[in-house]
Curated annotation (Swiss-Prot):
Record Pfam families: IMPDH (PF00478)
Protein name: Inosine-5'-monophosphate dehydrogenase
Gene Ontology biological-process annotations: GMP biosynthetic process; GTP biosynthetic process
Catalytic EC class: oxidoreductase
Keyword terms, alphabetized: Cytoplasm, GMP biosynthesis, Metal-binding, NAD, Oxidoreductase, Potassium, Purine biosynthesis
Binding residues annotated for IMP, in chain numbering: S217, D252, G253, G254, G275, S276, Y299, R300, G301, M302, G303, E329
Basic and acidic residues bias: start-end ranges: 96-116
Keyword NAD set for record: yes
Catalytic reaction(s) noted: IMP + NAD(+) + H2O = XMP + NADH + H(+)
Keyword check for Repeat: no
SS bond list: none
Amino acid sequence: MGTKNIGKGLTFEDILLVPNYSEVLPREVSLETKLTKNVSLKIPLISSAMDTVTEHLMAVGMARLGGIGIIHKNMDMESQVNEVLKVKNWISNLEKNESTPDQNLDKESTDGKDTKSNNNIDAYSNENLDNKGRLRVGAAIGVNEIERAKLLVEAGVDVIVLDSAHGHSLNIIRTLKEIKSKMNIDVIVGNVVTEEATKELIENGADGIKVGIGPGSICTTRIVAGVGVPQITAIEKCSSVASKFGIPIIADGGIRYSGDIGKALAVGASSVMIGSILAGTEESPGEKELIGDTVYKYYRGMGSVGAMKSGSGDRYFQEKRPENKMVPEGIEGRVKYKGEMEGVVYQLVGGLRSCMGYLGSASIEELWKKSSYVEITTSGLRESHVHDVEIVKEVMNYSK
């Protein structure tokens, strides 16, 4: 028998970070990081390339807050290019301050260029801009979509995400090599969970590695296929290789609380990709639904039947199958409506700042060097959550 046990896998709920002596206040920490070899972020947050999470409104919001959004690919090439152009044509605070300081700009202008009123300049003083002063944006493509990549690059996209459920595969590597040989663009490749995959993708030109097979709330890959590595262990394994090449790791999936972001970064990620937490915000493209007195937004995995029918089948090697022959690796569901994304991101960033303060880390690079963790038991997890009391007033950043 060739099967071997390569060890225990840990995920976010299995560990707690250990506090250090600190002279660092949360408000003083720097959250700047690398998305790829050549593209930076002001905050280490990325909205996922899902058709119920990121189109131009989400991407604009993320970039204005210092992160980045990845436009999903479940649309034709022209539509995806237009989504990228809407982000690039959005008037940033920098441009407003220089050219239209007193102008009240509508969210959607009549000439097709998207703009937004400058109601809260403090919230958007950390914008993630390219070298022309435009908001940064990424876009996802699948295997062999060279023409799509070319059109996106011509539209000014800042990064291409070559997206697959199994990034350590022949056609992904072939597509990566072709893009890198023909275009001057940074490419993130995923998803992977092993040292071998990380090394091979980097050696073939990857500028960023996306880590995670099956940790997402709407993903069933680990149950349907029996494949995956718990996310903390996957990040550790992949970052141990990527760090030697100076290539950033993006932790994709499994984030439920702000504390999980700190854990992902502490074990080696440079940024995290988020889906479900942002799916309930106003800026996501998911439809609203009122059930009783509660508003929800539609949210589905890219491995669900609905998403695969709309164009993500190639991500799961099922692009040519009829619906009744598809084997889904995700579900369709709903999440509670949360209002505008600014408040959600504020809580995530605030929790991360607190984490770094506890660990005495003024930067993400310091966090890598100073962090240590303990494995906890189910009793330790139970103790970590609210217990022996009934919550009578909900808070934005916690639910059990």
